Amino acid sequence: EKQLPKVDYIISNLPFIREKEIKKLNPNIKEINKLIKEQTKAKKTLSKKSDIFAYIPFYLYDIISDNGKIGLILSNAWLGTDYGEIFLKLIQKYFNIDRVVVSGNGRWFNNAKVVTTLLIATKREISDPVNLDRRISFCTLKEKLENIADIKKLSSEIILNKESEQVNIQSYSISEIKQLENIGIPWSGYFANLNWLPAITEKLLDSKKIFKFIRGERRGCNRMFYPAA
């Protein structure tokens, strides 16, 4: 058995494996929840509905050197689901999210049914206080990857937070994100300019006070419910 040295960077396209397959392929992976509880004293841990990508960054934490970076291609499910909210709260105890990149023009991988995102983050000390002034960039690619001739130029624009014909960039501080979260805006909304929203918070009304929402139901025989005119 050989002790591997810690690395400064990890770049990975993690597999997209649904919750149902996780138990078969790696039944011990959910032991990570025990580790998270021990290290963070968190009351909530990763949901049973989580894809496998939600577990792996926490394993990477001990492999990465101090202030090391991860670049992970993930399903976009973490941006707007219940288990994604828990994942976000937990991963930010281990890493400072620097930027999130999505496609605004089609999927990146034709052989994948899921929509992908790129998350770039820096390792932090779990016990360190949160820096509310630190900013996170939310980047939207305007062109398909295969149509972008100079990927290095695009990468530089993203790193420098410089908008161009190829990428739109919105940047929010942790303090601003907390404000938006309190309003009820999920992370999937931060790729748009929402700087105006906190100013009208007092004028907003919870739609549940006006409408009653129910979950849609799937039926096997749609013709029964949609008769011909």
Question: What kind of region is each of these model predictions?
Answer:
Residues 2-227:
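Signature of N6-adenine DNA methyltransferases within the class I
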